[in-house]
Amino acid sequence: MYAIISVGNRQYKVTQDQEFLTEKTGKNAGESFDAKVLLFAESNNKVHIGQPELKTARVSLKVLEDVKGDKIHGYVYKRRKNYQKAWGHRQQLQKVKVVSLSAV
């Protein structure tokens, strides 16, 4: 059984007890929440397609921990003007676990 859910601005294909990284959701570590938008679910070879989303299916998620993504470096310069600027960024992420998955 698997489902396609939308968390934040991204879509994820998830199964029972799967852990994945997502953008920061505003929840603290240890808190549980439901995926608000469920787009697709498959169970026992039956396919449920949302138009645009499923109302009967439910996916419960639990935030395990807050993590940071890989460092991204950037560099800007202007030739012959003695102007240069370096910057870096680390995306705030959360590790999330699928607690329960019900299709109907």
Swiss-Prot record:
Domain of life according to the entry: Bacteria
Keywords: Ribonucleoprotein, Ribosomal protein, RNA-binding, rRNA-binding
Single GO cellular component term: ribosome
An example Gene Ontology molecular-function term: structural constituent of ribosome
Disulfide bonds: none
InterPro entries, per the entry: bL21-like, bL21-like_sf, Ribosomal_bL21
GO biological process entries: translation
Function text: This protein binds to 23S rRNA in the presence of protein L20.
Family as reported in the entry's similarity comment: Belongs to the bacterial ribosomal protein bL21 family.
Quaternary structure annotation from Swiss-Prot or TrEMBL: Part of the 50S ribosomal subunit. Contacts protein L20.
Protein's name in the database: Large ribosomal subunit protein bL21
Organism in which the protein naturally occurs: Leptospira interrogans serogroup Icterohaemorrhagiae serovar Lai (strain 56601)
Organism phylogeny: Bacteria, Pseudomonadati, Spirochaetota, Spirochaetia, Leptospirales
